């Protein structure tokens, strides 16, 4: 979506899991504006975490309109298009599937699933629903990662 050639419409983002990685992601989204002539702008609009003291940090982000302890409330919002999830590993499958089924695109943390079967279930749901999923790896060029390719 683009409002004009000089002012692209923002991609509105929600974060589930506001700990260290959630704060890092929020900071990265804020720095996105430094990218000159980049066709996409990010706008963080909603954050979910079960700890009130973690959510409090996000009050300083002027674009955030929703702070909640319930990820389903975040996912029900029409103003959230993409969701970054940074929760404990054992919650990945459940929350990733909830994100996809809510019609949102997913920025996922590794591991994608706690095992191969979980990863396949998430992948299959994303394909079935036609959702975009990105799992980031900060070390793709380490020897072990290269051997797996």
Name each region found by the language model.
Residues 1-62:
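N-terminal Rossmann-like dinucleotide-binding module
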Residues 12, 43, 79-82, 105, ...:
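Structural signature of beta-strand start/N-cap positions in the alpha/beta core
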Residues 12, 54-55, 92, 110, ...:
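Short, cationic motifs built from Arg/Lys/His that form the positively charged side of catalytic pockets
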Residues 17, 88, 111, 137-140:
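Structured beta->alpha junctions
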Residues 35-40, 102, 127-131:
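Short helix-capping segments at alpha-helix termini
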Residues 61-125:
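Beta-loop-alpha module in the N-terminal Rossmann-like domain of NAD(P)-dependent dehydrogenases
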Residues 113-149:
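A contiguous active-site-proximal alpha/beta segment in oxidoreductase catalytic domains
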């Amino acid at each position: 979506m683009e409002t004009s050639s000089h002012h692209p419409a923002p991609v509105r983002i929600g974060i589930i899991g506001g700990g260290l990685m959630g704060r890092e992601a929020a900071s990265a989204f804020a720095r996105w504006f430094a990218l000159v002539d980049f066709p996409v702008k990010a706008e963080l609009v909603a954050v979910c975490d079960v700890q009130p003291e973690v959510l409090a940090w996000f009050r300083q982000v002027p674009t955030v309109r929703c702070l909640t302890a319930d990820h389903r409330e975040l996912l029900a919002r029409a103003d959230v298009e993409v969701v970054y999830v940074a929760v404990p590993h054992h919650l990945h499958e459940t929350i990733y599937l909830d994100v996809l089924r809510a019609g949102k695109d997913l920025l996922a943390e590794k591991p994608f699933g706690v095992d191969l079967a979980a990863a396949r279930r998430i992948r299959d749901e994303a394909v079935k629903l036609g959702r975009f999923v990105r799992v980031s790896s900060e070390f793709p060029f380490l020897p072990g990662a290269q051997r797996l390719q």
